[in-house]
Amino acid sequence: NNRSPQLRLRF
């Protein structure tokens, strides 16, 4: 899942 809050980018 690219929309993971762990990444917090712009997805």
Curated annotation (Swiss-Prot):
Keywords: Amidation, Neuropeptide, Secreted. One of its GO terms (biological process) is neuropeptide signaling pathway. It comes from Rhodnius prolixus (Triatomid bug). GO terms for cellular component: extracellular region. The modification Phenylalanine amide is found at F11. This is Short neuropeptide F. Neuropeptide. It is found in: Secreted. It comes from the Eukaryota. Belongs to the NPY family.
